[in-house]
From Swiss-Prot:
Belongs to the RapZ-like family. GTP binds at D62, V63, R64, N65. The keyword ATP-binding applies. ATP binds at G15, P16, S17, G18, A19, G20, R21, T22. Displays ATPase and GTPase activities. GO terms for molecular function: ATP binding; GTP binding. This is Nucleotide-binding protein RHOS4_02640.
Length: 302
C-alpha cells in the first residue's frame, strides 16, 4: 500500500500573551513560511482541504482567537496529527509569569483576559488555560531571558531548513541557585568537579578562561567524565536526527554558573563543533552579569 504524500508542513504557534508569539510569527515569515495569524480554529481544517501552496504554513493561535479554547486546540492537534497529508509541529513560545507581568507593567498594556484587572491576574489565568496545550508542544522556547534577536536566532536553528541540514545543538550553563532553565532536553550536574571559586586567583574569572578550564580539567574525575559525556552526546545526536528532531538543548549546572558549568559547556560545544554539528553556546549567569551593567534601553525582551 502506498502511503499518502505529506502535502503540508504546518507549524502551530501559540503561548501566553507577551511571551513573543508575534516575534516568532514574523521570524517564520522571514524564513519563507506562509503566515496566518489569529485564524479561527474552525477555519484551520478548511485551509488544509484546499490545494497545497507549495511552502510551509505557520498559524498563530492565542486566546484572542474568536473561538479559542484549550480543549478545541488539543482536538485540532489530534486531528491534524492523524491526517497523513500534514506534517504538524506545535511551537509553544513560553515565558515565566514574573517576566510576563514585568513586560505588561513596562508597556502598560492591558491583558486580554483581564482588561479591567491587574496584568498579574490575566497572566496567571492564561497560564492555567494554556497548561494542557503546553504539554503537547513539540518545541518549547522559553523567552524569559531572551531578546527578540535571541528568539529569532533560536527559531532559525529549529525551523529554517535552508540554514542547516543537520540537527542543531545548543549548550548552556546555569546556576542551580537561580533555578534550572526550562526547555532543556538534558541536564548535567557539574558540582562534583573541583571548584575554582576557592582559588583566589581564579575566583573573579569564568570558565571561558584557559586557566579556569585547566584547573577544572586537573580534577582526576574530569577526563573520564568528559569522555563519557562527549561519547554519549555524539551517540545520541544521529539518533535524535533520525527521529525527526531539529534541535537538542543541553544544560550544564554548577553552584554559581560561573566556572565549572561554563567550562564544561564550552569544551563540549567545541568538541561537537569539531565533529561537524551546528552548535550555539549560552551562559545564562554570565549574560545576567553583563546585562546588569548595560543601560536599561538595551534590555529589551522578546
Amino acid at each position: 500500500m502506498v502511503e499518502p504524500v505529506q502535502e503540508y508542513r504546518l507549524v502551530l504557534v501559540t503561548g501566553p500573551s507577551g511571551a513573543g508569539r508575534t516575534t516568532a510569527i514574523n521570524a517564520l515569515e522571514d524564513m519563507g513560511y506562509e503566515v496566518i495569524d489569529n485564524l479561527p480554529l474552525s477555519f484551520v481544517p478548511r485551509l488544509i482541504e484546499g490545494p497545497s501552496i507549495g511552502r510551509p504554513i505557520a498559524l498563530g493561535l492565542d486566546v484572542r482567537n474568536r473561538d479559542f479554547n484549550a480543549t478545541a486546540l488539543i482536538e485540532l492537534i489530534d486531528r491534524l496529527t492523524q491526517d497523513p497529508r500534514v506534517a504538524l509541529e506545535v511551537l509553544y513560545v513560553d515565558c515565566s509569569a514574573s517576566e510576563l507581568i514585568r513586560r505588561y507593567n513596562q508597556t502598560r498594556r492591558r491583558h486580554p483576559l483581564a482588561p479591567a484587572e491587574t496584568p498579574a491576574e490575566g497572566v496567571e489565568r492564561e497560564i492555567d488555560l494554556l497548561a494542557p496545550v503546553r504539554v503537547r508542544a513539540d518545541h518549547l522556547i522559553d523567552t524569559s531571558e531572551m531578546s527578540p534577536h535571541d528568539l529569532k536566532a533560536e527559531l532559525s536553528r529549529w525551523f529554517d531548513r535552508g540554514a542547516a541540514t543537520r540537527l542543531a545543538v545548543s549548550v548552556q550553563s546555569f546556576s542551580y541557585k537561580r533555578g534550572v532553565p526550562r526547555g532543556v532536553d538534558m541536564i548535567f550536574d557539574c558540582r562534583f568537579l573541583k571548584n575554582p571559586y576557592w582559588v583566589e586567583s581564579l575566583r573573579a574569572l569564568d570558565g571561558r578562561e584557559a586557566s579556569v578550564a585547566d584547573y577544572i580539567s586537573s580534577d582526576p574525575r574530569f577526563a573520564p567524565f568528559f569522555e563519557k559525556l562527549r561519547d554519549l552526546v555524539l551517540f545520541l545526536l544521529p539518533a535524535q536526527l533520525e527521529e525527526g528532531k531539529a534541535h537538542l538543548s543541553l544544560g550544564f549546572g554548577c553552584t554559581g554558573g560561573q566556572h565549572r558549568s561554563v567550562a564544561v559547556a564550552e569544551l563540549l560545544g567545541n568538541a561537537l563543533a569539531e565533529a561537524g554539528w551546528p552548535v550555539s553556546k549560552r551562559h545564562r549567569e554570565l549574560e545576567r552579569r553583563a546585562a546588569a551593567v548595560l543601560p536599561t534601553h538595551q534590555g529589551e525582551k522578546a
